[in-house]
From Swiss-Prot:
Family: Belongs to the peptidase S1 family.
Name the record gives this protein: Serine protease 46
MF annotations from Gene Ontology: serine-type endopeptidase activity
Native organism: Rattus norvegicus (Rat)
UniProt-listed Enzyme Commission number(s): 3.4.21.-
The organism's taxonomic lineage, starting at the top: Eukaryota, Metazoa, Chordata, Craniata, Vertebrata
Subcellular location: Membrane
Transmembrane is among the record's keywords: yes
Amino acid sequence: MACGSVDPQGLLSPPLSSARLSNVPHVEGPWFWSCGQTNISCKVVNGKVVEVGKWPWQVSILFLGMYICSGSLIHHHWVLTAAHCLQRSKNPANYTVKVGVQTLPDNSSSELLVTSIVIHENFINHMSHDIAILKLKYPVTWSPFIQPICLPEVNFKPSIGTMCWVIGWGLEKAKGAPKTPYSVQGVAVRIVNNEICNHRYQFLLLKNQKKFIGNDMLCTSPEWGLDTCQDASGSSLVCQMNKTWIQMGVVSWNFGCGRRQFPSIYTSTSHFTQWIKRQIGDLKFASMAVPSFLSPFILTGYILLVSLGSLWLL
């Protein structure tokens, strides 16, 4: 669905749904059946007709009220992001999260409180295990514009050359920064072999270090001259399989903006699936061959992991 050339008359839909906070059991709307789904519609934002609901898992993370990183909803209570985003402070009270945000800066959405931050115990300053999760004080209720992203099964990685998308606000061309306010964007990238990635970054190797890009990382190259840049940290790298979006990576770092010779580096989510499950702790497996047959009540409060040919409800 493209909105750019559509006449804005008659497209003034209601404002984006804010997260509804509640302590009662969740009852999802009839449109919700799994993770990794989109509900695209057109809306006038700052005088322009834009697509909304295209990346409903995307969240903005704020430190003392200022945007610092992106993240993604993986659970009613939990947000996935990069560990280096949370180095400013270990105090969860300093962080808040906004969901359902289309443009930055955003003054219309409520800031959701964070009760705990979990940084991977082996995290080393972008070089390894750059992954973290935030726990929200109150559960987020799904809506057409606020939904979770799927996570891959353990150690599953997309094939080399697969086209995926990086989602976030810190995406730009090699020259020229985006003007604010600007909308959440998605740019196409292709998966690059880690060995090629290591060769490109060999000048960064320390003495006696054999490789720079480990198995816990993924690499991509820009498809159309656009790539991750500043403020993109923590954003999701998503790939579509069987009409379902799966988060394969978390933006970690890159060398410059949009330089094809220097791939962008991501934390591989499949490498940390078990770690995420251990941290959240309330997970239960349930195989489902046909996700739409599941009751909305069953979906309540869990993460969805995806394997090829089936979905896994945790």
